């Protein structure tokens, strides 16, 4: 087998496993941190002896001063970044610790960008637009889904235009990522379901991406297998540590895959739903994934047939196209089994917005690695099929 040249980016240091949170203080110290801005949301901060309290304890034990910014919203806004930056500067912080899922991680990256780059954040939307080093970021992850703790992506919402934009740069990579499955125990079933489908979408889109390579394929394949075998159990019983560990590992692998292979139309379209309707990102991905998969099927039926097998479908004796169809059914069945809404109409979406969302989706950075090139009419039709 011959290989074309490819690069592969991951954070400098990654810690995984029960009690991994215990290293957060010493790692901040090794990075030269003296005063940390802990970025999180009000819900996580309110949990007694939860991830935020544990992080604070370990930071203080290591001699790190901490100030907490808990103003992060779901689908983090540019205004959240502005407010966090004000605290970062006022308190003279020199390191950022993010605690939570994708929203705190992306907001923390945004604060780091704003602290080191002039101008409007939106002006940096795109790939490798950042020119200055960010403050060190230590990402403590609490959900199995977005994998922002291991990626170069910073996804924010422009509150003026209600458009989600992505800043993709190796400078966004956290210096340290921490995945402690014990911090994920007991998460609500709807959150577990949505973030789990986000992870599956990462793995599937990375696997079929035009930018996929052998390393990203290996990570995506294992992620798909683990999610197919463990997501239902994690949703059904939040205290199932084995299922939580496997989902955390799957999310990590899927993140490492799409961090390098990029994504596709599911994310490009989901970003429009998140920006316009503030729809939870994982839910948007889950509703769209089967429909975008059907659209992409003819572009790479062999890989979709593989996905069917990875998800436990019996493809013996089937043609490649018939086996590929099973992948779509397996994805849709998993989503339904864990209680994800199946139609955009059930989520308050308006058909009148489809043309605009289709136009914006094709401008999203994730669209360019999709295996099949579409137009606005086709993307609007996918929205209608999901409606």
UniProtKB/Swiss-Prot annotation:
Organism this protein belongs to: Citrobacter freundii
Designated gene of the protein: dhaT
Organism superkingdom: Bacteria
Record comment: activity regulation: Inhibited by the metal chelator 1,10-phenanthroline.
Keywords, sorted A to Z: Iron, NAD, Oxidoreductase
CDD domains: PDDH (cd08188)
Protein name from the UniProt record: 1,3-propanediol dehydrogenase
Pfam families per record: ADH_Fe_C (PF25137), Fe-ADH (PF00465)
Catalysed transformations (reactions): propane-1,3-diol + NAD(+) = 3-hydroxypropanal + NADH + H(+)
Reported cofactor(s): Fe cation
Enzyme class, UniProt record, top EC level: oxidoreductase
Family that this chain belongs to: Belongs to the iron-containing alcohol dehydrogenase family.
Gene3D superfamilies attached to this UniProt entry: 3.40.50.1970, Dehydroquinate synthase-like - alpha domain
